[in-house]
Amino acid sequence: MAFQFPDHFRFADTHEYASLDGELVRIGISAFAVDQLGDIVFVDLPEVGDRLNRGTTFGSVESVKAVEDLHAPISGELVRINESVLSSPDELQNDPHGEGWLLVVRPADPAQLQDLMDAATYANKVAIESSN
């Protein structure tokens, strides 16, 4: 299956994305990760005001197949969570790159975004993982 990833997104090895929106960064999980999980039944996210540290676990997504930890692609202060994903996980399932975003962070160091993969590099990674 071929996936489309927005050009302005940056991706972590663990399949989370970060999208710069002004001074804030929107974080979610990629369509590839959602596809691998299957039907999502529960999403666990931290509280507004919490601090995320790049590479550390900040929540989880539970599907009928597995529970997967979510890892922060960048460090920063959590300023908003997507409440609708908590109450209706199918929003994450149906539109992971749009209405299914997870949180918004005020980045501690916006330069950390440059350490993440661009969409083309991530698409290549996904193609390799899909063929294994």
From Swiss-Prot:
Coiled coil regions, renumbered to chain: none
Gene3D superfamilies: 2.40.50.100
Cofactor detail note: Binds 1 lipoyl cofactor covalently.
Transmembrane segments: none
Domain (Lipoyl-binding) ranges: 24-106
A cellular component annotation (GO) from this entry: cytosol
InterPro entries: 2-oxoA_DH_lipoyl-BS, Biotin_lipoyl, GCV_H, GCV_H/Fam206, GCV_H_sub, Single_hybrid_motif
Domain of life per record: Bacteria
Modified residues (N6-lipoyllysine): 65
Keyword entries, A-Z: Lipoyl
Known cofactor(s): (R)-lipoate
Gene Ontology biological-process annotations: glycine decarboxylation via glycine cleavage system
Family of this protein: Belongs to the GcvH family.
NCBIfam families assigned: gcvH, PRK01202.1
Subunit field text: The glycine cleavage system is composed of four proteins: P, T, L and H.
HAMAP family reported for this sequence: GcvH
Role according to the record: The glycine cleavage system catalyzes the degradation of glycine. The H protein shuttles the methylamine group of glycine from the P protein to the T protein.
Name recorded for this polypeptide: Glycine cleavage system H protein
Organism whose genome encodes this protein: Prochlorococcus marinus (strain MIT 9313)
